[in-house]
């Protein structure tokens, strides 16, 4: 049958069906029929019902229907990759929603054809967030309508409610969706990879995009490549319905897809593991729910579910396997039932249509139909009282709502003053006020996807066609080149508002004399040369700043360096202007050439890295002062005392450091930048250099912590190489050690081909015998280095964390182009080493939280334990400084201090505020954890909540034992016992004498850092018992200053006493 099914719809096109009224009557049978025609291969199909069929006579009476939780969809991103945040709004009626949707601010723009509207959608996705009336529980079908009634489809999914009495809102009950222009549903498959049905009752059309199930893994790999941070947090992060990827990006990476427009009165059917997304053209109303066939059972057994939220939809497959796959039930329970899903095969119910290869005819035989399996579930539907929904524990299919709006999203983003007019839709640049949620680390401005929308008329070509010119075009920005980042008064749109300078601004008219006039300059030529170089450094930069502002000429003011004997001549303004012009020209050329393969260019003479080298001759012997020596005793800095670049080179110290780091998981010098994050998040690694884990010799392969995107992202380019060089199928990579300096790296992180991975392998620096070369982007030695511009060297980890650094040869991870790093980034001072060095050196990164100015070198931050983790595109690394460390994260990882009776603590009072209180008594209570039959869970049950046995007398049930649980709604539900958890409880007493029993998570010691939510509700008294309210000393205030009447109005002045008498 496989070969037969492959001939059906081989191009995986979205198919449209027009059933007759007779064919339309049996829903499950018609679904089986369209699968026999190959409709399921596209992942999406359209069904146009007979003209005589209507689910509702009129929709004029629904204006008072309440939309309880509308969501405003705030979209951030660029270049075809977006993240959608749902912000819940107050309830409104359909009448109010329609009025908003049809207003000038939210209405559909004018368009002549669908392709034009589609282009406007993707270009203006981040502007003017629309409101979506999603997830409204209910149906608009009239009661007498039996055909394709979304409220009672009578498929095998109804067994969930029949067997367990469980209803899951939006899954086996219908949901209504009220849309407006630009409201979107992000890329996702259905919960548990079920089927879904969507009927558009009335209003404007809805556009759909679909990826065939057989190519779903490719879409997941693409999404994980662009959003590695989300992928690490949750394997099934696309189920969050927050990721929007444009069809242009799909075509660019060769992922097959198709698109279709759903008109009012039409059905859309999605199939298991069919990724789909789309948007509404204007005000409309749709109704949808999920259903299942026998083919789905295998998908449900293998579905990868969201792991970051326990209340996500999960359906127990036990009843389905037991009923429809009895021969495999025991194997499945033992975890040995493994089967590869063939996405091309239709559902078993389609066998009758494949036998005769004819059309859909009335069924003559008595062949079993899914309807009959669940017929009993519908009997007595009206007479029986339905079991109430346990709202606290049953997952519902709802859009993921942001509980807290990201702090970087301003109010102006949520409620822009005015929408783009029709003439502004061709804008290619996002306004400065509409920045992404996370501020950009790059000096390159965020640019909207301005590419012409391609024609996808033939999806078969989409599979193989590779776009050759998919790159952000910036022809319109020639008047404003990238060198604007050199201006000291950098605007936030250019640098993301994140490059903060500790020094004051220097005037562009400063002369060389004012910057380098040193009366005590010695007469030897070496010293004089260093003075000239210092003068060149400051004046060079200032002159370029003048050009960046568009002055058109260099700053005025004659050089006034006092020449001493053999001192070289000073640099003229004309030469500096030539340097600036040369640098500006190179920037423009670099922007227009292909990013990944362009050769390394030499750095301009005025570049900070060149100037640092020029002025470093007199600082190579820089010694630490006694005060600075004392600082080296800090815990994180002590092992690095011999590795600072301002100390004499010490190759043996580097080698010893590399050997120590090789012993620590993940045993790779490059992956170490994410070590702190994995320590805190997963508790996987040792805490200090001294705690060596397994010997390096025994560890030949480990899984790299750095996603491939970190090596390929360059700020604004979406050119990601999806291939991961030198990685095994299980995701691990070989570890290799340099025989000379002992640095240990993954072959994939350092770009070591398997042929070269041997005991004789040497790193690039040792191969070039450049043992005294240091990283030009930081201030520490040791680690894995690669060659950069002008024969300089950089740490691979520094190049990964600095967004603007670029790996020219991605596979070999070298050379590294640092010419695109904005000059203001070199002005930042590292908070860790600024006291250890007499001069500023290297290039810093900054904390990613808001506009936090905290800056540090990558290597310093890694050594000090700053948390760095993979971020989502267009960023690379998300950095959390010590000021923004989340207290809850530390508390959750076992860092809680012990508490004793009589200790003063802070806890939550019954009035909802936090007060200081005293621990009176410590007790231990036992809570039970169970998994309910519907897939939900509870971990805070009391023993008396188990009604199937007396747990107070007999103790907890055995693990895995089936139990009956009485829930808070009074109903009894089936569940399986997981474990019992003895929890330490604390009885605390407040100042007003009231006492509460709380868990450790709800108690804060006086030494702990309080979360913001606690600080904002912290008070010093309980129930009006204020400290010293009657004994507080009276505050003496100065008498009011006597008012002096203006002489011009003295005659008009009336004494207050006289005024009151007149008024009386």
UniProtKB/Swiss-Prot annotation:
Where is it made, tissue-wise?
Answer: Widely expressed.
Where in this chain does the record put each JmjN domain? 14-56
Residues in domain Tudor?
A: 897-954, 955-1011
Q: What is its main location?
A: nucleus
Where are the stretches annotated Interaction with NCOR1?
Answer: 597-638
Q: What's its top-level EC category?
A: oxidoreductase
- Region: Disordered, residue numbers: 354-384, 434-489, 502-537, 549-573, 590-643
> Pfam families recorded for this chain?
JmjC, JmjN, PHD_2, Tudor_2, zf-HC5HC2H_2
Q: Which Gene3D superfamilies match?
A: 2.30.30.140, 3.10.330.70, Cupin, Zinc/RING finger domain, C3HC4 (zinc finger)
Q: How does it assemble?
A: Interacts with histone deacetylase proteins HDAC1, HDAC2 and HDAC3. Interacts with RB and NCOR1. Interacts with VRK1.
- Tell me the protein's name: Lysine-specific demethylase 4A
Organism for this UniProt entry: Mus musculus (Mouse)
